[in-house]
Amino acid sequence: MERGRTEIACILPSISDQFSLSMVNGILSAFPMDSYICHLFQSFNPSLENRLLQKCIDTGISGIVLFPQDQPFFSEQLLYLLLQKYPLVLIDRNLPRLDTSYVIGDNKTGGALCLRHLHALGHQRICFVSSARRNTFTVRSRIDGILQEAEARNIPESSITIWDFFNKHQPYVHYQKQMMKLIREERITAFIAAESTTCAYLYSLFATMNLRVPEDISLMSFDKPLVESQRPDFFTHISQSEYLMGKEAGTILKHQIETRDPQVTHRVMSPLLEVRKSTRAIVL
């Protein structure tokens, strides 16, 4: 520990896209540089997350902002932090039955906004694609929002295709046949990507299949994708205000540390639909 400055940790699954970078910058904005040191860690998997939490405990880190991995059981480290009333704020994902502070986006509403937007454009058969498994907290909430909105609009659940555990590291040719089947046989006309990186992959995949966005297929995403061949304002997306989410999480943690007040605080950030050029009405 460095004398004179309080050391905190920020642990995210990865810090590799605009969403996570913006979130980290929001967290850092809450802590004056002259009085805090923030250690940034990438956890990548549950096992490494647990080791990082243990390292923070062993070295006397004063507080943690954690974007938690999705695990079937709470780790010993998380339970220890909870019992010790340790300054801890979860971000972007809360863990049911774990009574700790969190700042998350309203993923169910975000899913509903996606479905509502595409249905208003005339899309009746839609595919939701995620690189994570459908039972993870965030993905499950987004799917619930999509399906509930579909039910409210009398769209049969069979018209919504859920494609989870999508591997963005596969060569495009790996998915071309399966994707063409969805479009030609199942008549999918619009895709919702659960992650900005998945959206970018799908856009490039469609290009290899001579499918144009949005002329041939509509594509939208959670969070703002970045694709070299397109301007930053091209993609219709759900904005989760990740910078503000990070700033709010940092502010809560800073208050806990400086006041020694373990009071649990919950914040849910409202999503915004940003309509751009990657979605358009069905042309009959």
Regions found by a protein language model. Name each.
Residues 180-284:
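Flexible loop/turn connectors
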Residues 114-153, 265-281:
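An alpha-beta-alpha
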